[in-house]
A protein has these predicted regions:
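Intrinsically disordered, low-complexity regulatory regions
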Residues: 1-76
Length: 76
Protein backbone atom coordinates (compact mmCIF):
# COMPACT_ATOMS: atom_id res chain seq x y z
CA UNK A 1 0.00 0.00 0.00
CA UNK A 2 1.26 3.47 -0.89
CA UNK A 3 1.79 5.70 2.18
CA UNK A 4 0.81 9.08 0.74
CA UNK A 5 1.83 10.95 3.91
CA UNK A 6 5.21 9.47 4.86
CA UNK A 7 6.50 7.89 1.64
CA UNK A 8 4.55 8.91 -1.48
CA UNK A 9 5.62 7.08 -4.63
CA UNK A 10 6.56 10.29 -6.46
CA UNK A 11 9.26 11.02 -3.85
CA UNK A 12 10.86 7.59 -3.80
CA UNK A 13 14.38 7.13 -5.01
CA UNK A 14 17.80 6.15 -3.75
CA UNK A 15 17.87 9.36 -1.71
CA UNK A 16 14.82 10.64 0.19
CA UNK A 17 13.74 14.00 -1.19
CA UNK A 18 13.45 15.49 2.30
CA UNK A 19 17.10 14.64 3.00
CA UNK A 20 18.15 16.33 -0.23
CA UNK A 21 16.10 19.42 0.63
CA UNK A 22 17.58 19.68 4.12
CA UNK A 23 21.10 19.50 2.72
CA UNK A 24 20.46 21.93 -0.15
CA UNK A 25 18.84 24.59 2.04
CA UNK A 26 21.29 24.46 4.94
CA UNK A 27 22.44 28.02 5.62
CA UNK A 28 19.70 29.59 3.50
CA UNK A 29 16.98 31.74 5.02
CA UNK A 30 13.50 32.86 4.10
CA UNK A 31 12.60 33.06 0.45
CA UNK A 32 15.96 31.66 -0.68
CA UNK A 33 15.32 28.45 1.26
CA UNK A 34 11.72 28.23 0.07
CA UNK A 35 12.53 28.76 -3.60
CA UNK A 36 15.50 26.40 -3.52
CA UNK A 37 13.53 23.65 -1.77
CA UNK A 38 10.51 23.97 -4.04
CA UNK A 39 12.58 23.97 -7.23
CA UNK A 40 14.39 20.82 -6.10
CA UNK A 41 11.13 19.19 -5.01
CA UNK A 42 9.53 19.69 -8.42
CA UNK A 43 12.66 18.57 -10.28
CA UNK A 44 12.90 15.49 -8.06
CA UNK A 45 9.38 14.28 -8.81
CA UNK A 46 8.59 15.59 -12.29
CA UNK A 47 8.85 12.28 -14.13
CA UNK A 48 6.85 10.39 -11.49
CA UNK A 49 4.02 12.86 -10.93
CA UNK A 50 3.03 15.84 -13.07
CA UNK A 51 5.54 15.85 -15.92
CA UNK A 52 5.99 19.18 -17.69
CA UNK A 53 3.79 20.97 -15.14
CA UNK A 54 6.31 20.18 -12.40
CA UNK A 55 9.18 21.35 -14.62
CA UNK A 56 7.39 24.65 -15.17
CA UNK A 57 6.82 25.00 -11.43
CA UNK A 58 10.53 24.38 -10.78
CA UNK A 59 11.36 26.99 -13.42
CA UNK A 60 9.03 29.49 -11.72
CA UNK A 61 10.80 29.05 -8.38
CA UNK A 62 14.23 29.33 -9.98
CA UNK A 63 13.21 32.52 -11.80
CA UNK A 64 11.75 33.94 -8.58
CA UNK A 65 14.98 33.17 -6.73
CA UNK A 66 17.05 34.86 -9.46
CA UNK A 67 14.81 37.95 -9.28
CA UNK A 68 15.24 37.99 -5.49
CA UNK A 69 19.01 37.72 -5.77
CA UNK A 70 19.18 40.40 -8.48
CA UNK A 71 17.22 42.75 -6.23
CA UNK A 72 19.32 42.07 -3.13
CA UNK A 73 22.52 44.10 -3.09
CA UNK A 74 23.98 41.90 -0.31
CA UNK A 75 24.28 38.95 -2.74
CA UNK A 76 27.36 39.13 -4.92
Amino acid sequence: MNDLVNHPEHYQGKVECIDCLESATEGLNGIEAVCTANAIKYLYRWKRKNGKEDLLKAQWYINHLIEHIDGDSTNA
